[in-house]
A protein has these predicted regions:
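Active-site rim elements
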Residues: 38-39, 92-94, 140-144, 244
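Short aromatic-enriched loop/helix-cap "lid" or pocket-rim segments at secondary-structure transitions
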Residues: 75-78, 129-131, 181-182, 227
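Outer membrane beta-barrel
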Residues: 1-126, 149-154, 158-167, 249-250, ...
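Loop-centered beta-sheet repeat module
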Residues: 126-128, 133-180
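Outer-membrane beta-barrel pore domains
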Residues: 29-40, 50-53, 164-346
Length: 346
C-alpha cells in the first residue's frame, strides 16, 4: 500500500489467472439480441482491489475504488493464512460472493477497541441467483463491465477489547432486481425490488497455543417466489449466462474451526497446527409455495494439518466428508495445498 503523502495512499490486489478461466459474455443487440462468449480476457490479470484512500486521522478514512465487501468472516479475512482449510470455508463461499469485491466508496476508522466500516456499493444482479449458491454469482458480472442500476450498503463493526479476541458484526442491504444490461419496464416482474438482507456474526481467538474461529450468517431475499419464476423463464438463447433455477428466500451458514500449535512449546518460530473444522449450511430455504431441495443442505466435517515454516507460507493437508440427506451420497474428500500470503508496503 504505497503512501502518497498528505494522508493519501493507494492499494491494489492482483490475481494472475493462468488457466484462461475468465470468459466474457456480450449481447449483440444488432443481431436479434443474441449472446456471444468472448475469450479474449482468458488468462489475463484480474484486478480484485484498486482503491485510493484519504486518511484524516485514525478515526476517519475515506476509500474509493474497487474494494472488498467485509460481510462475513471469510470476506473480511480472505487470505489463506486466515483459515485452516485448504479451500476457503465452504459455507460462506457458497452462499455469498467470495472474495466479494465491488466498485464503491468506504468510510472506516478506529476508536479504542472498536473498528467500524460503512460502504456504498452497486447492488447485486438477481438474474444470476440460483439454488446451489443463493446470491454467490450475483456480484460477478458475466459481461466486460458491471451494471449498477441498483444501490446497496454494507457495514461492519469489530471489537477487540480482550487480548487475542475479536468479535464482529457485519451486514448488507440492497435491491437486486432490474440490475442487468437488459430490463423490461413493462414486464410483470419489473415492480419487484428483490431486496437482499444479510446479517453475520464472526469471532476469532488466538494465543500461543490455540486458534479458534467461527461464524454464523443468515440471509433473506424478498420477492423470492417472483424472482424464482422470472429466473426459470429467462431466455434459453445459446450463450446466455443465466442459471434458470429457483432461488431461496433464505440461506444460512454456521461454522467453527480450532487448531492447536504443536510447536508452541519450542523456541522455533515455525508453527504446526492440528485442526478440526465443522461447517453446516443451506443455500436454499424455499419461499412459500415452493418445494425444498434436499441436497442444498450440507454438513462438512474435516480435519488436517497446517505447517507454517515462515509467516507468509503455509503447507496444508485436509481430509473430511460432506454429509447430505439420506437419499444422496455423502462426499469424502482430501486436499493438499501450498499457500503464500504477502503484502508489499511502501
Amino acid at each position: 500500500m504505497p503512501a502518497l503523502g498528505r494522508g493519501w495512499s493507494v492499494g491494489t490486489e492482483v490475481e494472475f489467472e493462468h488457466g484462461g478461466t475468465e470468459v466474457a459474455v456480450e449481447k449483440e443487440t444488432e443481431e436479434t439480441g443474441e449472446f456471444e462468449q468472448e475469450v479474449e480476457r482468458g488468462g489475463e490479470v484480474a484486478l480484485e482491489q484498486f482503491w485510493v484512500q484519504k486518511s484524516f486521522n485514525k478515526h476517519l478514512n475515506v476509500r474509493a475504488g474497487h474494494i472488498v465487501v467485509p460481510v462475513g468472516m471469510t470476506n473480511n479475512g480472505h487470505t489463506p493464512n486466515m483459515f485452516f482449510s485448504v479451500y476457503r470455508p465452504e459455507g460462506e463461499k457458497t452462499i455469498m460472493p467470495c472474495t466479494w469485491h465491488e466498485t464503491g466508496i468506504s468510510v472506516w476508522g478506529k476508536a479504542g477497541s472498536w473498528r467500524y466500516e460503512a460502504q456504498l456499493l452497486p447492488g447485486l444482479n438477481s438474474n444470476l441467483f440460483n439454488d446451489q449458491g443463493w446470491i454467490h454469482n450475483g456480484s460477478a458480472s458475466p459481461y466486460e463491465f458491471r451494471p449498477a442500476n441498483a444501490l446497496a450498503c454494507a457495514a461492519r463493526v469489530d471489537w477487540s477489547g480482550i487480548k487475542g479476541l475479536r468479535l464482529s458484526l457485519s451486514g448488507y442491504l440492497g435491491g437486486s432486481n432490474n440490475n442487468d444490461i437488459v430490463t423490461d419496464p413493462n414486464g410483470k416482474y419489473y415492480k419487484y425490488n428483490a431486496v437482499v438482507a444479510i446479517g453475520a456474526f464472526d469471532f476469532a481467538y488466538k494465543n500461543q497455543w490455540l486458534t479458534v474461529r467461527g461464524n454464523v450468517d443468515y440471509g433473506h431475499l424478498s420477492d423470492a417466489a417472483a424472482i424464482s419464476a422470472r429466473n426459470k423463464n429467462q431466455t434459453t438463447m445459446t450463450g446466455n449466462p443465466y442459471p434458470h433455477t429457483f432461488v431461496g428466500e433464505g440461506a444460512w451458514d454456521a461454522a467453527v474451526e480450532a487448531g492447536v500449535n504443536m510447536l508452541a512449546w519450542s523456541k522455533t518460530k515455525q508453527k504446526l497446527y492440528l485442526f478440526g473444522r465443522y461447517d453446516q449450511y443451506d443455500s436454499y430455504v424455499p419461499a412459500d409455495g415452493l418445494a425444498d431441495i434436499g441436497w442444498c443442505a450440507r454438513t462438512v466435517v474435516s480435519g488436517g494439518v497446517n505447517w507454517c515454516p515462515i509467516p507468509e507460507v503455509a503447507v496444508k493437508a485436509e481430509g473430511g466428508v460432506r454429509l447430505l440427506d439420506s437419499q444422496y451420497n455423502d462426499e469424502p474428500f482430501f486436499a493438499l495445498g501450498v499457500t503464500w500470503t504477502g503484502f508489499f508496503i511502501h
